[in-house]
């Protein structure tokens, strides 16, 4: 509207949604770190558990498994835990998939993965933990790639003295 354009010069801060605004909106798996099993086995378990989920991170994991032609396991039970992750049953075993808080709340030691999670998070990646019963199997990092134009646009805002805040 004309009124919005007239007041635009007063803007001090721009708040942007990350997914689809700054990024492509298509997360991809960037790192797979396993403990006691192969990376492909971890990806098989992870994709199997994530298959019923509609979360964009689940889609990235499933796509990574499909690219490697990994056959998925059958999932018997599937429970989404809001803000935490998923609890599922496969081959008679309880599988946990989610953030560190979910692992902590279920008494699952992250077995030295905290430093790796911190490093990956600092790179702008989202880290998901996977555990079977009470044993951590590994972590998978997922990242949404920034759009080609995002850096230049943010630089332009900063040149104009406008702060940029990203919501995630």
Predicted features and spans:
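Cytosolic catalytic headpiece
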Residues: 2-168
């Amino acid at each position: 509207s004309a009124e919005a354009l007239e007041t635009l010069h007063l803007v001090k801060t721009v708040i942007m949604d990350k997914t689809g605004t700054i990024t492509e909106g298509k997360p991809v798996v960037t790192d797979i770190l396993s403990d006691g099993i192969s990376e492909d086995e971890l990806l098989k378990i992870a994709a199997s558990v994530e298959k019923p989920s509609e979360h964009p991170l689940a889609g990235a994991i499933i796509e990574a498994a499909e690219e490697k032609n990994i056959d998925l396991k059958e999932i018997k039970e599937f429970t989404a835990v809001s803000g935490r992750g998923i609890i599922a049953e496969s081959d008679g075993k309880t599988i946990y998939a989610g953030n560190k808080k979910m692992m902590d709340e279920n008494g699952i030691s992250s077995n030295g993965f905290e430093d790796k999670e911190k490093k990956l998070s600092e790179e702008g990646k989202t880290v998901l933990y996977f555990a079977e019963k009470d044993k951590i199997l590994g972590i998978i990092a997922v990242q949404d790639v920034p759009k080609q134009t995002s850096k230049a646009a943010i630089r332009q805002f900063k040149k104009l003295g406008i702060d940029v805040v990203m919501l995630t």
